[in-house]
């Protein structure tokens, strides 16, 4: 993937200004609520029986923050995102057995939450760069699947 200087600038600034403790939990909770089959990977996280239980689940919130912080790795390695996510891809494939399509689903939920929070500040240019960035991250996370 080739990045323009404008895309690099948008991504770096955009990610750095996200409120991880707000956006991460909301995005993961939305994913688990809207796509309930994704809950199967979170059986050890406690009560996921209702949308309110999911939204109020501290383990889900903490994992949402962790996932969002995981994007920092891609920002720091934009010229080699595939390599930066190699170990995470193996972990999700070989140990956790996560369906790789769920990475795209979570990215979609993340985009919805960010757009809702930023409103007009989530410009077309920002979304364009962010969607490209997420597509590369999703590809990298699914790369080690066999």
Swiss-Prot record:
Protein name per its UniProtKB record: Hemoglobin subunit beta
An example Gene Ontology molecular-function term: metal ion binding
CDD domains assigned: Hb-beta-like
Keyword Metal-binding in record: yes
GO cellular component terms, semicolon-separated: blood microparticle; haptoglobin-hemoglobin complex; hemoglobin complex
Source organism phylogeny: Eukaryota, Metazoa, Chordata, Craniata, Vertebrata
Family: Belongs to the globin family.
Organism whose genome encodes this protein: Thunnus thynnus
Gene name of this polypeptide: hbb
Cited InterPro entries: Globin (IPR000971), Globin-like_sf (IPR009050), Globin/Proto (IPR012292), Hemoglobin_b (IPR002337), Hemoglobin_oxygen_transport (IPR050056)
GO biological-process terms attached to the record: hydrogen peroxide catabolic process
């Amino acid at each position: 993937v080739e990045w323009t200087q404008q895309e690099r600038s948008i991504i770096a600034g955009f990610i750095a200004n996200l409120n991880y403790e707000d956006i991460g939990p909301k995005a993961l909770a939305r994913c688990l609520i809207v796509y309930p089959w994704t809950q199967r990977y979170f059986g050890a996280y406690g009560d996921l029986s209702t949308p309110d239980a999911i939204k109020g689940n501290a383990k889900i919130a903490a994992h949402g923050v962790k996932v969002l912080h995981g994007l920092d790795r891609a920002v720091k390695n934009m010229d080699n995102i595939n390599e930066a996510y190699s170990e995470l891809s193996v972990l999700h494939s070989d140990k956790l057995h996560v369906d790789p399509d769920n990475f795209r689903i979570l990215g979609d939920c993340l985009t919805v939450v960010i757009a809702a929070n930023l409103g007009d500040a989530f410009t077309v240019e920002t979304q364009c760069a962010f969607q490209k960035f997420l597509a590369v991250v999703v590809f990298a996370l699914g790369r080690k699947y066999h």
